[in-house]
Amino acid sequence: MANRNNVTEFILLGLTENPKMQKIIFVVFSVIYINAMIGNVLIVVTITASPSLRSPMYFFLAYLSFIDACYSSVNTPKLITDSLYENKTILFNGCMTQVFGEHFFRGVEVILLTVMAYDHYVAICKPLHYTTVMKQHVCSLLVGVSWVGGFLHATIQILFICQLPFCGPNVIDHFMCDLYTLINLACTNTHTLGLFIAANSGFICLLNCLLLLVSCVVILYSLKTHSLEARHEALSTCVSHITVVILSFIPCIFVYMRPPATLPIDKAVAVFYTMITSMLNPLIYTLRNAQMKNAIRKLCSRKAISSVK
């Protein structure tokens, strides 16, 4: 296989080849990346430092924010630095690392969002059993399952891609390495592999998305027996979670639940689910959550007081 693989690096065309647009891309995506990192790190620090945020919901939210920070760091820094240069290349091993990182963190996030939906279901539909069911060791186990599941998903994907022969061309019409862009460059028949990718990525996204939507429907149906205040709080939680699910899953389903072909819109979709979603998630979960907003205010005021002293 090594003799058939003559490609040592790939050329990335990026979002655009227009020099003026590349300067705009540098500024815009630098702002997006910085905001995403600040927002997600702020949530992790706030939850870790706030005794009032010790429930399983915030435990999972802290991990989700950590994953979002990691996920946005897989491709965004290279996109930003590449916008400063005319020639955009990535080594073969670097390309494989990008693919692994992207699918690892995305796989962890997909499973963790499903875990969070289960947590919401138990909290709203079975409140009397919540502390019994969602014990600390159970929460830690569920997070561990998310990490293992993401690792297995990414490992399976990368093992198949690494075995493909790349004889040239080596030009990728994208700003990052992704499965479909790579298998289209392979000098062998990849039809079966394309179907496998659709099953391993697209079908998993679709299945988890349906499970999440069903859980939300069950939760909303059960709210008719709750008080008005409880309904409002539960509805706010569900709306935030449904919004994040839609932002995370719809692009995944669009990209992978189709034949292995690259479309012009794929770049815009990739920007959305690799960068924009990671920036929006902290806003979605904090703007509608009074406890999070209060905890952030207390943390900021504490830091301000300590800096004055």
Swiss-Prot record:
Bilayer topology: Multi-pass membrane protein
Molecular function as annotated in GO: G protein-coupled receptor activity; olfactory receptor activity
Sequence ranges on the Extracellular membrane side: 1-23, 78-98, 157-193, 257-267
Chief subcellular location: membrane
Glycosylation sites: 6, 87
The keyword Glycoprotein belongs to this UniProt entry's keyword annotation: yes
Transmembrane segments: 24-47, 56-77, 99-118, 138-156, 194-217, 234-256, 268-287
Assigned protein family: Belongs to the G-protein coupled receptor 1 family.
Biological role: Odorant receptor.
Protein name: Olfactory receptor 4C13
Species for this entry: Homo sapiens (Human)
